[in-house]
């Protein structure tokens, strides 16, 4: 039995589709099973989430492999970025060890570091360390920015494109190697069959693109190309923090999310790790049919 967290997310939903198609026995840790869509009738359900450590024990019963994709890039009513990423992963690892799990696959991010400027990447570094320090057979998968046609970010950009111009936080020069969610999912599924996997896989697409160009491409893919307006970081920070103070968790965007788009996520390994798993990531032009 495989336990999948984050099954309703961008990568998790793609992984789940591939696992159920391959008839892999899957249990999903979810707060609302309805968000699994049609896949919910093909899997076991364990009610719970990262903010509910007691739910881990039931979810892990009889599990041999954990694929831990769940994450939070903003504070939520049920927990902070640090609690839902770093501390929750540490607790999940402890519960997995107690349950006799064999392999723990953790989904991190390129650039995760205890000294990073962003709270998210610092929390991911804490989570990585908890996994690496465990007695479990462990694998860390660290992708660059992940995208998919119709994902939340593209939907947000489409809404922003109703305006004459689309704002971009800062200078937009942060560099990424964008990788399609389905290519990441293929890597995860391939990893499950690997007898002696590497301890770490850095997943990236075939090209290095800055944030300005990524935004422009996604707008073209949505059929709404627009001029981009670079807004100085201090102005973005003040505006988003003020919005968060008023709207709380309902804010359409947060400073923590915007700040992530000012941090490069690249690897000198390029697509090498994905290819080790038998996956040749497609370019944005190929995937989005630009």
Regions flagged by a language model, labelled:
Residues 34-91, 95-98, 110-114:
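NAD(P)H-binding glycine-rich loop region in Rossmannoid oxidoreductase-like domains
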Residues 82-86, 105, 124:
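Short alpha-helix in the Rossmann-fold core of NAD(P)-dependent oxidoreductases
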Residues 187, 191-254, 264-290:
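Mid/C-terminal beta-alpha module of Rossmann-like enzyme folds, strongest
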Residues 75, 110-122, 146-151:
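Conserved catalytic-site region of short-chain dehydrogenase/reductase
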Residues 5, 29, 69-70, 104-110, ...:
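SDR active-site strand-loop-helix element
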Residues 108, 129-152, 159:
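Conserved beta-loop-beta element that borders a ligand/cofactor-binding pocket
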Residues 91, 152-153, 170-193, 199:
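Substrate-positioning beta->alpha
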Residues 1-24:
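N-terminal Rossmann NAD(P)H-binding glycine-rich loop of SDR-like oxidoreductase domains
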């Amino acid at each position: 039995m495989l336990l999948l967290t984050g099954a309703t997310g961008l990568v998790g939903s793609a992984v789940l589709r591939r696992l159920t198609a391959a008839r892999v026995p899957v249990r999903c840790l979810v707060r609302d099973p309805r968000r699994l869509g049609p896949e919910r009738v093909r899997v076991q359900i364990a009610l719970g989430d990262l903010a509910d450590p007691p739910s881990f024990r039931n979810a892990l019963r009889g599990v041999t492999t954990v694929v831990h994709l769940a994450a939070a890039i903003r504070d939520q009513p049920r927990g902070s970025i640090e609690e839902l990423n770093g501390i929750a992963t540490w607790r999940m690892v402890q519960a997995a060890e107690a349950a006799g799990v064999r392999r723990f696959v953790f989904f991190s991010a390129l650039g995760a570091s205890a000294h990073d400027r962003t709270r998210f990447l610092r929390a991911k570094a804490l989570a990585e360390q908890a996994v690496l320090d465990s007695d479990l057979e462990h694998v860390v998968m660290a992708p660059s920015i992940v995208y998919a046609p119709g994902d939340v970010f593209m939907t947000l950009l489409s809404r922003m494109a109703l305006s004459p111009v689309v704002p971009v936080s800062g200078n937009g020069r942060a560099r990424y190697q964008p990788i399609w969610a389905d290519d990441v999912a293929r890597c995860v599924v391939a990893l499950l069959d690997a007898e002696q996997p590497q301890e770490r896989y850095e997943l990236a697409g075939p090209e290095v693109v800055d944030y300005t160009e990524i935004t422009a491409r996604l707008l073209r893919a949505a059929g709404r190309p627009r001029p981009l307006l670079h807004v100085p970081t201090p102005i973005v920070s003040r505006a988003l923090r003020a919005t968060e103070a008023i709207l709380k968790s309902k804010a359409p965007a947060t400073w923590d999310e915007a700040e992530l788009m000012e941090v490069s996520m690249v690897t000198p390994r390029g697509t090498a790790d994905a290819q080790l798993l038998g996956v040749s990531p497609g370019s944005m032009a190929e995937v989005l049919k630009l």
